[in-house]
């Protein structure tokens, strides 16, 4: 089981973490999960100019119907990835993140749909902290990451998809191929909770400087 010691205090000024809508069918579930965790959150269209974003503590790049493995485009997500805040990419957001930083995302040889088993790799990193080594997640993808970028490591894998999760060495960029926001993902709430904790620690670090 992965271990990540963290804290965040929602009695203080709430964290501001927005969800970038890439056209995913479950984007509102990501927003609701953040609301449940007492985060100040909005759903933002992925065409929104960078200068129109609020002052954010973190961003989630949602999944979507876009075939990132084939087109390599996802609204203004490239500009958002330049921000110095923690970012979590889900499904298409994960694939785009990998491509943006020099990895490879393309069509899956074995697309996955429905409940699947994944195994944590390399300790699972921060997002999988407190979750089981083997767990059930909800998949819905035709494309996948085939190679993580330099400076990233694999955090989870399944028999048919070797990169179900990734994290950079700095610990502020995270990608998940599956959908933690769907109820069938066994530890989805814990994953969002862990991302919120990362955002809190990043804000605390900036405030102390």
Annotate each PLM feature:
Residues 50, 74-90, 95-190, 194-198:
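Pocket-forming structural segment of enzyme catalytic cores
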Residues 1-9:
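N-terminal amphipathic/basic-hydrophobic helices that include classical n-h-c signal peptides
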Residues 14-20, 24-90, 94-95, 101, ...:
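Flexible gly/pro-rich beta->alpha loop and the following alpha-helix that scaffold active-site loops
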């Amino acid at each position: 089981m992965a271990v990540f010691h963290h804290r965040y205090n929602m009695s203080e000024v709430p964290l501001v973490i927005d969800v970038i809508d890439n056209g995913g069918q479950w984007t509102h579930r990501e927003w609701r999960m953040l609301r449940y965790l007492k985060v100040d959150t909005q759903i933002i269209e992925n065409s929104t100019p960078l200068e129109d974003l609020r002052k954010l503590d973190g961003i989630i790049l949602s999944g979507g119907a876009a075939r990132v493995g084939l087109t390599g485009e996802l609204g203004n997500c490239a500009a958002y990835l330049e921000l110095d805040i923690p970012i979590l990419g889900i499904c298409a957001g994960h694939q785009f993140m990998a491509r943006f930083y020099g990895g490879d995302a393309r069509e899956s040889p074995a697309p996955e749909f429905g409940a699947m088993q994944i195994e944590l790799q390399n300790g699972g990193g921060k997002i999988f902290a407190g979750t089981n080594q083997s767990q059930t997640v909800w998949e819905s993808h035709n494309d996948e990451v085939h190679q993580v970028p330099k400076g990233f490591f694999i955090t989870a894998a399944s028999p048919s998809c070797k990169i179900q999760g990734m994290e950079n060495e700095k610990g502020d960029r995270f990608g998940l191929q599956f959908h933690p926001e769907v109820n069938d993902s066994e530890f989805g709430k814990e994953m969002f909770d862990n991302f919120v904790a990362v955002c809190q620690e990043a804000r605390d670090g900036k405030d102390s400087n």
